[in-house]
C-alpha cells in the first residue's frame, strides 16, 4: 500500500494520488523540443486551437439546431442566423474553422513529408496523424449534411451511394448507413449523432494517442539531425541553455507558439468577419429537394482532389466498370498517405532540399494535388486548353498514383544505395 502523508496543499494532495508532477515533467516541462525548428512546427498547436474553437462554437449551435428534415434548414438559416443573438457569428466561426482546419492539416502533413518526419521511430506519429485526418474528414462530411440544403442532400446521396460499389453487401451497407432506402430523416439524425457525439470522442482519443506518440521519438528538426534528447535535456537543466540543442515544451516552445497562434487568429477572424462566404456553398442556401438535382455536384474544396480521382477513370476495363475503377482509385487516394513510410525505402531522415530527386518529387506531388482540386470543381464534360476535363482528370489521377507507388520507391531506393 502506498504511503500517503498529510498534504501540504491541493497540488500535493493530487500529486500523491495521481503523480501530477511527474506527469507534468514527462509531458510538458521536460519534454524536449529541438531549437532548430521554424514557425511551421506551430501547426499542431494551431490545429488544437481550431479544434477547441470548433467544439465551443458547435456547442452554441447545437442548442438551437433541429435534427429533423422539416426543421433543420430553417433552424440554421432563420433561427440561428436571425433570431439567436450573435447566432450568425457562431455559425460563421464554426464554418470558417471547419474549412481552415483542413488548410492547416494539409500544411502540417506536407511539412512532415518535406522533412520526412515519418520514419526512424516516428511511424506511429505519422499513422495517428493520418488517422486524425480521416476522422476529421468524416466529421466534416457529417457536419456538411446538417444544414439540409441542396448540396447537403445531394452530397449525402452521392457519398452514401459509393458504398453500393462494394460487392455483394454494398446495397445493404448503403441502406444501413442511411437508415432508409433513400437519404431522409433517419439519415439526418444518424449523421447528427456522428457529428456531435461519436466522432468528436474518437478525435479526442486519437489526439491523445498522437500527442503520446510524440513523447518518445520527439519531433524532427529543420536539418533532420539526430539529437540525443536526454543528454541535451540534462545540459538545459544544468543551466547550459546556450549549449543545449533543445528547449522544454513549456514554457520555451509554447511561448513561441502562442505568438504564431495570435497571428493566425487575426487572419482567422478577418475571414470570419469579411470572407466567411468562402466556407459556405451558395447552392446550400436552397432547401433540400430530392426532385431537383443540382447542375453540378461537388464536395468542399478540401475533398476536391480525391473527388477528381473518383471520377477520373471514365472507361471500362474488361469486367470492371468505370465506376468501380474510380471507386478503387478513390479508396486508394483516401488511405494512400498512410503508406508513405512504406513507399519511402531509404533510411535517410533529411529535408527534401538535401535530395534533388525527392525535392522534385515533393513539389510535383503538391502541384498535382492542387490541379486535381481545380479540375474537381469543374464539370466533367467541360474542356480546358482544348482538352476535355475527363482526360485531364485521368492524367492527373495516374500521376498521383504513380508518384506514390512507383516514383517514390525508386528515388528512395537510389538514395539508399548512395548512402
For each predicted feature, which ranges?
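Membrane-embedded and interfacial regions of multi-pass energy-transducing membrane proteins
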Residues: 2-100, 104-419
Amino acid at each position: 500500500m502506498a504511503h500517503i502523508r498529510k498534504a501540504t496543499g491541493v497540488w500535493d494532495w493530487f500529486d500523491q494520488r495521481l503523480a501530477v508532477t511527474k506527469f507534468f515533467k514527462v509531458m510538458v516541462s521536460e519534454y524536449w523540443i529541438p531549437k532548430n525548428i521554424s514557425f511551421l512546427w506551430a501547426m499542431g498547436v494551431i490545429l488544437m486551437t481550431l479544434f477547441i474553437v470548433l467544439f465551443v462554437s458547435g456547442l452554441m449551435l447545437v442548442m438551437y439546431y433541429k435534427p429533423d428534415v422539416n426543421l433543420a434548414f430553417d433552424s440554421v438559416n432563420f433561427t440561428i442566423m436571425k433570431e439567436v443573438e450573435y447566432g450568425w457569428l457562431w455559425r460563421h466561426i464554426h464554418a470558417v474553422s471547419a474549412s481552415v482546419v483542413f488548410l492547416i492539416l494539409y500544411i502540417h502533413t506536407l511539412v512532415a513529408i518535406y522533412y520526412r518526419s515519418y520514419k526512424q521511430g516516428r511511424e506511429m506519429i505519422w499513422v495517428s496523424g493520418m488517422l486524425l485526418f480521416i476522422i476529421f474528414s468524416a466529421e466534416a462530411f457529417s457536419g456538411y449534411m446538417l444544414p439540409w440544403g441542396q448540396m447537403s442532400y445531394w452530397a449525402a446521396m452521392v457519398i452514401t451511394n459509393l458504398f453500393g460499389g462494394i460487392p455483394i453487401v454494398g446495397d445493404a451497407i448503403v441502406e444501413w448507413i442511411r437508415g432508409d432506402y433513400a437519404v431522409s430523416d433517419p439519415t439526418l439524425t444518424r449523421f447528427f449523432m456522428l457529428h456531435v457525439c461519436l466522432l468528436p470522442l474518437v478525435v479526442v482519443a486519437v489526439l491523445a494517442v498522437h500527442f503520446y506518440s510524440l513523447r518518445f521519438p520527439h519531433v524532427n528538426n529543420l536539418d533532420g539531425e539526430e539529437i540525443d534528447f536526454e543528454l541535451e535535456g540534462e545540459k538545459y537543466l544544468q543551466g547550459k541553455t546556450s549549449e543545449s540543442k533543445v528547449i522544454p515544451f513549456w514554457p520555451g516552445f509554447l511561448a513561441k507558439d502562442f505568438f504564431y497562434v495570435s497571428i493566425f487568429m487575426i487572419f482567422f477572424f478577418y475571414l470570419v468577419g469579411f470572407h466567411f462566404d468562402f466556407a459556405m456553398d451558395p447552392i446550400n442556401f436552397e432547401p433540400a429537394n430530392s426532385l431537383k438535382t443540382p447542375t453540378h455536384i461537388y464536395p468542399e474544396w478540401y475533398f476536391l482532389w480525391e473527388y477528381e480521382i473518383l471520377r477520373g477513370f471514365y472507361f471500362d476495363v474488361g469486367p470492371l466498370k468505370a465506376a468501380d475503377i474510380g471507386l478503387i482509385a478513390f479508396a486508394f487516394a483516401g488511405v494512400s498517405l498512410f503508406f508513405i513510410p512504406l513507399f519511402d525505402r531509404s533510411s535517410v531522415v533529411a529535408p527534401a532540399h538535401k535530395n534533388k530527386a525527392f525535392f522534385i518529387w515533393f513539389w510535383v506531388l503538391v502541384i498535382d494535388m492542387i490541379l486535381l482540386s481545380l479540375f474537381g470543381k469543374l464539370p466533367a464534360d467541360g474542356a480546358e486548353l482544348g482538352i476535355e476535363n475527363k482526360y485531364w482528370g485521368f492524367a492527373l489521377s495516374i500521376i498521383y498514383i504513380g508518384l506514390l507507388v512507383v516514383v517514390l520507391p525508386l528515388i528512395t531506393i537510389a538514395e539508399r544505395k548512395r548512402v
